[in-house]
Amino acid sequence: MSRVVVVGGGFGGMAVAARLAKTGHEVTLLERSPDLGGALGSVSEEGFTWDAGASYTLLPAVLRDLFRKTGRPLERELELEPLDLVREHRFEDDTTLALPTSRAGQLRALDALEPGLGERWAAHVDSFTEDWEVLRQHYFEHPWQRAALPDPVRRRFDSREMLHKRLKKTLKDERLRELATFPFLAEGHDPRNVPAWMGLVAYLEQRFGTWHVPDGMARIAEVLAARLATRGVTVLRGTPARDVVLREGRAVAVRTDEGDIDADEVVVAVDPRGLPSLAPLVERTMPAIPPVVCHVGLEGDVPDLPHEVVLHGDPLLVVRTGGHAPDGRHAWTIHGRGKIAEDLLRALARHRIDVRAQLVHRVDRSPRELVQQWGSSPLGVLWQGRSTVRARLGPDTPIPHLHTAGAHATPGAGLPFVGLSAALVAERIGPA
């Protein structure tokens, strides 16, 4: 049995703590705030409740695997349901696309928008099939060997082709390019700096669908917190980690204000920049910055919108309608990116979605406030070209017995990838 200290009680830290405890390790989890879950939480005011971060996820198998390997299966703990639509897109030329999750549905919807668009989009998505299969085996689902990458992986990681450049060659319709780049723009990345192979996100959306928890995504964190208690994890809330203690070049403890907590293995599931011993290892990276967020409580008649609507342009606006509200009321969240020179609800009204008269409550959150609340950006490391994939830590680090998980670790941000990061660390450490 090894003593493992996990730094960070967001989804990544909770997932890796549960996995390691189930395999027999003595696990202590440190969380700086009073609550677990991090960005996988909720905001509640005046009877309204909104998802604080993600409102849906990809790759449901990641959650199912986590729950199956740490105790009761997912289906016995919470509802995880598929969504019929990936999202609705409203383009600057006043055309609208409700994008289904299935390949056949996407073909039909795009051909209805303009004949021939469906086949072009299908060919684009299909082109990432091999990327996913190669990287799934050697990067996403198993700890990668940085010094001995298989040739198919090395070719992708060394490629200078960025997503923007590939799309200019393969997708001549501006609306299709906006479909392909939206997931990255929404998380603060410039497609000119995102490797082309990361376009596989469109493949994952189509192949595996988008899924949500009807009661709110925070339920995942609540159930995981109970799972930690079941597995005997010692959870220290309100206990920020100040640094990882190194002795003879290896990690031996985590420093807190109350003293050092000895460890045989340390897992850092927060932004490494916040820990002096790790900061030099990530000095070539930058965090991706959260959007401007406005949670609104509405009353009366409002437009009937799907769970997510993307309003293309500058600023880029995203409307999420799946919050919980009392009868006769509605809970929406609006994200804004780009040139935001006016109130988000006023900007929304310019797209003919005017709910200012229905507003009864609002919660505004700036990028700075979000980072301060969570201690770091939940969007992880900013893509700065092909070097980013190697500059990001995880599951190992150059320091023996020190590992990283979470949004700032391999393989990246987003609920499914953070879940995979936890599985990678658990596999690397192994059973007790």
Where are these regions (language model features)?
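Helical element adjacent to the flavin cofactor pocket in flavoenzyme catalytic cores
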Residues: 200-251, 255-257
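A conserved FAD-binding loop/helix module that cradles the flavin
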Residues: 54, 407-430
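Hydrophobic anchor at the start of a short beta-strand
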Residues: 25-27, 266, 357
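N-terminal glycine-rich phosphate/pyrophosphate-binding loop and immediately adjacent elements
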Residues: 2-133
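A glycine-rich dinucleotide-binding beta-alpha-beta segment and adjacent secondary-structure elements
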Residues: 173-187, 354-411
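Mid-domain catalytic core of redox enzymes
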Residues: 242-329
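C-terminal segments that line or cap access tunnels to active or ligand-binding sites in enzymes
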Residues: 294-373
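Rossmann-like flavin
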Residues: 92-195
